[in-house]
């Protein structure tokens, strides 16, 4: 019975996702020997760095290749026109590039099932008048050619004939956002998720008018000879949807970037430039197997990299350690920057090691940071509470829903360790994740700049690969 129902659902999804006017020619079965995924560079799409590859589309592509039991080959292109041409010429099997569903794309390609949703927003910089209408602009709009934003503007132009814009083929969305911040262009249009991610590094970005709401982000398949791949994609999507993978990736890439503090972001960027150089070597030395940037981000959240920081509750130093914790891990002077960093790293590592093995490696740091903030015992209380509510106690996306409940008597009176400021722990972890992302971006920018200065003759030609943007007591709190 279950198989029968699944077959019906699969058939329905296949019909719904096809939506292509091109007539199928005779389908020739083709067994993939590798999955060739065409993509664009971007922090939420596909990024490469010394720490490995990342991106929503990349992570999903890895899982899809595993599902198909074939090697994955990511093929980055410089613009959408090249991507489309490559798919039509069978140089790639699928496009996974953070693209939204549009009428034009439905006519040209087969569209996969929805991955997540975004709004299209008008972007401008801090200090410019807030536009109240698309006709109320004090400058030009610049967008990427062949993008969904061109389709949106074309539709708006029918109602507003005087609306004009510039299209560029030699820039990507990240570059246009940087040009907004640097006062090189006046306006652009971007997906809301892209703005949320990039304003961590470009705090002067502002999003105003919502031009399109709740657009599905999808993958693109060839309009013909793709029945087999589409069927496999739908079955894979159904499996990962039920497993919570889509929810996990949404939380991983977008869950911590929605909260934004303009003043704090600018202050952090200044501190990276003026304060961090004094302590970077200490973070790198004592991080051990941890990413030094996560350790540095935690320290900034704790003390703003002030070795003399003190709080009324008695915590002190760069990592704001309590006296009992300092004694436990062998720290004699909490106000000594190196001792504090060494102690904080040891304590954080201990929190990670204490966590159950059932928590995935990719999420252990967030559980450990919550333990660092409110204590391991309270995190265990929250995990048990999550399980009682039929949520996943090993998924950070579910734990962050439950932690604030530890402040409500209805819930904490049923726990072993009682009341805890769980909402503060969620804010604490999200803030560190934002600081960490910013540190990664700045670090990659610096490495890319140094590489360019050392090897100027090796710069890619205009026809070469696209550059990478941004290269992008243990039961008590400490």
Swiss-Prot record:
Q: Where in the cell is it found?
A: Cell outer membrane
Residue ranges crossing the lipid bilayer per the database entry: none
Keyword terms of this UniProt record: Cell outer membrane, Cell wall biogenesis/degradation, Lyase, Membrane, Signal
What Enzyme Commission number(s) appear in the record?
4.2.2.n1
Region labeled Non-LT domain — which residues? 23-257
- Kindly identify the residues recorded as the active site: 302
Into which EC class is this enzyme placed? Answer: lyase
Q: How does it sit in the membrane?
A: Peripheral membrane protein
**GO molecular function annotations of the record:** peptidoglycan lytic transglycosylase activity
What is a biological process (GO) this protein takes part in?
cell wall macromolecule catabolic process
Using the UniProt annotation, give all residue ranges assigned to the region (Disordered).
446-478
Write down the SUPFAM superfamilies for this protein, in alphabetical order: Lysozyme-like (SSF53955), Periplasmic binding protein-like II (SSF53850)
Listed Acidic residues bias regions: 451-461
Q: Which GO terms describe its cellular component?
A: cell outer membrane
Enumerate the catalysed reactions: Exolytic cleavage of the (1->4)-beta-glycosidic linkage between N-acetylmuramic acid (MurNAc) and N-acetylglucosamine (GlcNAc) residues in peptidoglycan, from either the reducing or the non-reducing ends of the peptidoglycan chains, with concomitant formation of a 1,6-anhydrobond in the MurNAc residue
Signal peptide (residue range) = 1-22
Region annotation (LT domain) maps to 258-478
The function of this protein is: Murein-degrading enzyme that degrades murein glycan strands and insoluble, high-molecular weight murein sacculi, with the concomitant formation of a 1,6-anhydromuramoyl product. Lytic transglycosylases (LTs) play an integral role in the metabolism of the peptidoglycan (PG) sacculus. Their lytic action creates space within the PG sacculus to allow for its expansion as well as for the insertion of various structures such as secretion systems and flagella.
Q: What is known of its domains?
A: The N-terminal domain does not have lytic activity and probably modulates enzymatic activity. The C-terminal domain is the catalytic active domain.
Identify the NCBIfam families for this entry. Answer: PRK10859.1 (NF008112)
Q: What protein family is recorded?
A: In the N-terminal section; belongs to the bacterial solute-binding protein 3 family.
The record's PANTHER family line, in alphabetical order, gives: MEMBRANE-BOUND LYTIC MUREIN TRANSGLYCOSYLASE F
Q: What name does this protein carry? A: Membrane-bound lytic murein transglycosylase F
């Amino acid at each position: 019975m279950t198989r029968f129902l699944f077959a019906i659902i699969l058939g329905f999804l296949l019909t719904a996702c096809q939506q292509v006017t091109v007539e199928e020619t005779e389908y020739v079965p083709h067994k993939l020997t590798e999955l060739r995924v065409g993509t664009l560079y971007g922090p939420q799409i596909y990024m490469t760095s010394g720490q490995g590859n990342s991106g929503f589309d990349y992570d999903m592509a890895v899982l899809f290749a595993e599902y198909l039991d074939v090697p994955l080959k990511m093929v980055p292109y410089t613009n959408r026109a090249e991507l489309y041409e490559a798919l039509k010429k069978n140089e790639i099997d699928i496009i996974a590039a953070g693209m939204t569903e549009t009428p034009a794309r439905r006519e040209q390609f087969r569209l996969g099932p929805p991955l997540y949703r975004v709004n299209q927003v008008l972007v401008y910089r801090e200090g410019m008048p807030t536009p109240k209408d698309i006709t109320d602009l004090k400058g030009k709009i610049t967008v990427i050619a062949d993008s969904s934003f061109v389709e949106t503007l074309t539709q708006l132009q029918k109602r507003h004939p005087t609306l004009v814009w510039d299209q560029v083929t030699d820039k990507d969305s990240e570059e246009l956002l940087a040009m907004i911040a640097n006062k090189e262009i006046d306006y652009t249009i971007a997906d809301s998720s892209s703005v949320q991610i990039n304003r961590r590094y470009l705090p002067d970005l502002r999003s105003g008018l919502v031009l399109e709401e709740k657009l599905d982000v999808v993958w693109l398949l060839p309009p013909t000879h793709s029945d087999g791949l589409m069927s496999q994609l739908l079955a894979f999507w159904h499996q990962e949807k039920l497993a919570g993978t889509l929810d996990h990736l949404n939380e991983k890439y977008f869950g911590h970037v929605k909260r934004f503090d303009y003043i704090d972001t600018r202050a952090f960027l200044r501190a990276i430039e003026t304060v961090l150089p004094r302590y970077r070597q200490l973070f790198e030395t004592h991080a051990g197997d941890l990413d030094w940037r996560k350790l540095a981000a935690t320290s900034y959240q704790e003390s703003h990299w002030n070795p003399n920081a003190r709080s009324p509750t008695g915590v002190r130093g760069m990592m704001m350690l309590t006296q009992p914790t300092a004694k436990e891990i062998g720290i004699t002077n909490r106000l000594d920057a190196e001792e504090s960093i060494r102690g904080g790293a040891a304590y954080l590592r201990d929190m990670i090691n204490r966590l159950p093995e059932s928590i995935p490696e990719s999420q252990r740091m967030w559980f450990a940071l919550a333990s660092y903030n409110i204590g391991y015992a309270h995190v265990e209380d929250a995990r048990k509470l999550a399980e009682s509510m039929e949520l996943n106690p090993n998924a950070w996306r579910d734990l962050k829903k439950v932690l604030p409940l530890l402040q409500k008597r209805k819930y904490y009176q049923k726990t072993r360790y009682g009341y805890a400021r769980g909402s503060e722990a969620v804010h604490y972890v999200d803030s560190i994740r934002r600081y960490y992302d910013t540190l990664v971006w700045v670090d990659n920018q610096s490495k890319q700049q140094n590489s360019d200065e050392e090897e100027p003759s090796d710069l890619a030609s205009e026809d070469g690969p696209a550059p990478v943007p941004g290269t992008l007591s243990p039961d008590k709190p400490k």
